[in-house]
């Protein structure tokens, strides 16, 4: 079984299903391009790589982290590690270049909104964006992010799902995007993924 570190099996299965969709929908693209925001120990980076290698595909992986929590090591040798704030390095990537963007950085409402609008244009039509720690079961005041007030859910895990609702993603109100997965392990104190497909070019 491929290991994904802190990501639950439910979350991992949704991510793997999405990567499988990508492999099927882009049969002529040997290399699958991925951006991950928030690296930590790199387990999810290695998990996605291992899954794609098992599918006989290559991976061009960019991992972004600002090292606020700790020094970050490159998850694997071929990974391109970018040290910096996600909202400051997004223009290093070409528009319509990525098959999959995994957002697991600063879990506050304003940062999740910023990450969507900074990176949505980087996703190619038919590609996907995945947001972590979106479970409906989560205590919105859990997982304070170290900024703002501990009593403000927008500065805690509650900010992630609220951000997706504010953008219009959760109810399929944002043109050009479609909700594919909204799943979580109810026994997990964190976690959950919302995965959205880009169904037309962002403009």
Sequence positions of predicted segments:
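A short alpha-helical cap/connector motif
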Residues: 1-102, 106-203
């Amino acid at each position: 079984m491929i290991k994904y570190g802190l990501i639950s099996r439910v979350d991992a299965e949704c991510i793997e299903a999405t990567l499988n969709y990508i492999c099927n929908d882009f049969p002529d693209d040997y290399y699958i391009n991925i951006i991950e925001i928030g690296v930590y120990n790199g387990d999810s980076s290695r998990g996605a790589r291992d899954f794609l290698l098992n599918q006989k595909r290559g991976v061009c992986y960019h991992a972004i982290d600002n090292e606020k929590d700790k020094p970050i090591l490159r998850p694997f040798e071929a990974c391109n590690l970018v040290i910096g704030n996600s909202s400051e390095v997004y223009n290093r990537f070409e528009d319509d270049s990525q098959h999959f963007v995994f957002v697991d950085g600063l879990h506050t409402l304003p940062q999740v909104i910023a990450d969507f609008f900074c990176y949505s244009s980087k996703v190619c039509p038919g590609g996907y964006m995945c947001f972590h720690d979106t479970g409906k079961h989560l205590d919105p005041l859990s997982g304070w992010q170290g900024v703002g007030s501990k009593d403000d859910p927008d500065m805690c895990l509650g900010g992630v799902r609220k951000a997706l609702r504010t953008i219009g993603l959760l109810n399929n109100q944002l043109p050009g995007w479609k909700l594919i997965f909204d799943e979580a392990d109810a026994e997990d104190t964190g976690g959950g993924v919302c995965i959205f497909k880009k169904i037309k070019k962002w403009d």
